[in-house]
Amino acid sequence: MSPEDSSTASVSRAPVPEGTISVAVGLFVNGISTYIFFKIGQQALGQDGFKPIVTMWFIAFALVPGFFLPIEQETSRALAHRRALGQGGLPIIKRIIPLAAVILGGLLIALALAARSATDNLFETNSAVTLALLFMLLTYAPMHIARGLSSGQGKFSNYALIIGLDGTIRVGV
């Protein structure tokens, strides 16, 4: 590399990759919101009363990333690849949405079949917690698709907004 090439490369380089700051802010907001959610919930319901919600939380965050994070990542990767080639992303979207719907449907059917047992054995007979788990699955599936679409199109501020809203909405609910 000639001296001119190296000086041009160093001048054009940003100190951090595009989107780093906005995603960091979104993650920070989500983290603080999660802490607030647990703090308020435990104070309002007491440690024993909050236990079913904590159980639901851990079940949801074992299922959701396990099933929907790969969809988010593949959506992002495929869209970024097509964007680099100057191609549209509609073919990716047409494949990802039905796939996510089938996975979500399978999870909802499994939860429906296990609802009574889950309510009795995991959520201390609180059926509202079982419904909350169902609601979480219904909302996190499209959220992961939206995150994949945002990051794949290089719209990291939208990605960060989704992450931040995830936490703040949880506190509000």
Give the location of each predicted region.
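Short, Lys/Arg-rich, polar N-terminal cytosolic tail immediately upstream
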Residues: 1-17
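Hydrophobic transmembrane helix module of multi-pass membrane transport proteins
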Residues: 2-4, 100-173
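Signature of the first transmembrane helix
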Residues: 14-72, 112, 136
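Hydrophobic alpha-helix/TM-entry signal in multi-pass membrane transporters
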Residues: 15-23, 57, 96, 129, ...
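Hydrophobic alpha-helical interface/terminus motif in multipass membrane transporters
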Residues: 41, 75-79, 118-119, 150
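A helix-boundary/kink motif common to multi-pass secondary transporters
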Residues: 45-49, 80, 84, 155
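Membrane-interface alpha-helices at helix entry/exit sites of multi-pass transporters
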Residues: 52, 85-99
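Helix-loop junctions and terminal segments of transmembrane helices
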Residues: 68-84, 152
